[in-house]
Every structure is written in structure tokens, then in C-alpha cells.
Amino acid sequence: MNRLLKTIIENNRKWISEGKVASYIPELSKMDKNLLGISVCTLGGEEYWEGDAEVKFTIQSISKIVTLMLAIIDNGEDYVFSKVGMEPTETAFNSIVNLEAKESHKPINPMINAGAIVVASMVAGKDSDEKFDRILKFTRKISGNNNIDINLNVYKSEKETGHRNRALAYFMKSTGALKGNVEEILDVYFKQCSIEITCKDLARIGVMLANDGVSPYTGDRIVPRHVARIVKTIMVTCGMYDASGNFAVHIGIPAKSGVGGGIVACAPRRMGIGVLGTALDEKGNSIAGTKILEELSKQLDLSIF
């Protein structure tokens, strides 16, 4: 497996030149464009990795699957999806278009920024600190890594420059789609996106989902089976933003990307995969990371379709 991973990384390194690091968050623009790594965890608990698999980077939008799991556990799926939809979108992850166009004004799915902000508001906690503390502890639990923490520099950078997210949140507040204190909810959202992880952490989260919510390391149920199923389904339809259909055709497994360059993926009942490739395509997905997953999926016949 390690030889295969090494070959796949080298085969797809050339794609880095066609992408660029996220620049709209100043701290992210400082990232090394050439980082490339992969980690794979099997249902048998075996781990393989190559490249920059132990380099820390911020989770960004991959945190949306973490908070979605937590919100469903806290509130039940019916309540959560009464506040946010579950349909794919052809618009960008930070677009306001669908919020204005739809009569209900509720966000179209939990993987776009507007939807994730509403989901963050549904995580239980008496204040923003308690909500984020629960998100952080849950991230540690599902990854099996108690050392995961927030990158304060990225958090401050996001908070200072997150004008589009503020606009989305205040627009939803004005239509009644978002309840609660907007700045407190945004604080939770900016913090959750600034959690620092590695490819290895992502692969462990992926394998937990691949195993229907059960840790292959301990045998403990971490997430209810129906929650894992819902999240994997949303990952297939919406996880790669407005490139989700293309990803489903060419790679065919549940996945979620983040503008930090990470992608978490899972091949149900087979393996979890974590990829880092900081150079992004025009959709905000890791360009080399996506190509790595495409080659891995073809080599191991991972597609669920």
C-alpha cells in the first residue's frame, strides 16, 4: 500500500502548478503551495501514509461534517433539516444567491457556508465557548487524537476578514432563518474552521464513517449509525461544493473538502482517506488532492456506484 501511495503522489504532483492557495483568508495565503500528502486507514485498523501526511493544517469546511454530526445527535435529523436543506447547489460555497431566491430563505444544504453557520447555531451549549468546546472535544473523539487544537492565528485572520460570512449570517437573521446572537454564532463558526489537523486525523475520521460510526481501533460506537449514513450521503451530494457531481462520477466515494487543502473521504466498509494538497482549483477543492483520490479510487476500485 505504501508503495502505491508513493507512486500516486508522484504521479499527481504535476497538478500543483495549476492551482493556488486560498488567498481570501490572509493566514491561509502563507501556506506552502507544494504540500502534498495522503493517509489511509483500513477497517482492520492498519494505517498507511506518504508525503506530508503529518503536516498540520486547518480543517476549514471539513469541520462542517463534524458539526452536522453533532447537531443531529443534539437535535435529531428532523429538526436539523427543517432549518437547513439537503439539496446540491450549482452556486459557490459562499454564495448568497439561493438565500435570496428561495421563499423559505433556509440554506440549501449544510455544506455551504450559510448552511454550516445555521448548523453551528444548533450545536448545544449555553454560550459560544461551550459550543466550540464541544465541537473541539468531538473532533478529538472521532479522530482519536486528544492533541487536536485551534490555530489562533487563523481564527483571528478569519474573524477579521470574514465579511462574506457576516453578510450571509445577518441576511439569514433578517429573514428568520438564523436564530440567536449572530456574532456569537459566527465566533463558533470561525473557531471550528480554525481547528488544526493532519491527513492522519482525517483518515481516522473517514474510517469511522466507513465503519458506520464505529471506531475500528476500539470497537466503540462513536456516532449513531443513522447519523453516519446521513453525513456520508450529504458528502456525496454536496461535499465537494459545486464540483460534487463531477467528483461522484470520477471518484465515487463520500468526501468533504476544505480550503486549507484537506479532503476527508471514505470508502464504506473498506477504508478512510485523508489528503492534503494546498493548491486549490477554481471551485476551492485541492487540485492535486482530487487527482490523487481519482487514481486511488481507480486502482482499488473504490467507487460505490
Swiss-Prot record:
Superkingdom, natural source: Bacteria
Cysteine disulfide links: none
Presence of keyword Signal: no
Gene Ontology BP terms: glutamate biosynthetic process; glutamine catabolic process
InterPro entries the record matches: Beta-lactam/transpept-like (IPR012338), Glutaminase (IPR015868)
Binding-site positions, substrate: S61, N113, E158, N165, Y189, Y241, V259
UniProt xrefs under SUPFAM superfamilies: beta-lactamase/transpeptidase-like
Reaction it catalyzes: L-glutamine + H2O = L-glutamate + NH4(+)
EC number: 3.5.1.2
GO MF terms held by the record: glutaminase activity
Keyword set, alphabetical order: Hydrolase
One Pfam family from the record: Glutaminase
Assembly with partners or alone: Homotetramer.
Family membership noted in the UniProt record: Belongs to the glutaminase family.
Classification via HAMAP family: Glutaminase
Protein name in the entry: Glutaminase
Species in which this protein is naturally found: Clostridium botulinum (strain Kyoto / Type A2)
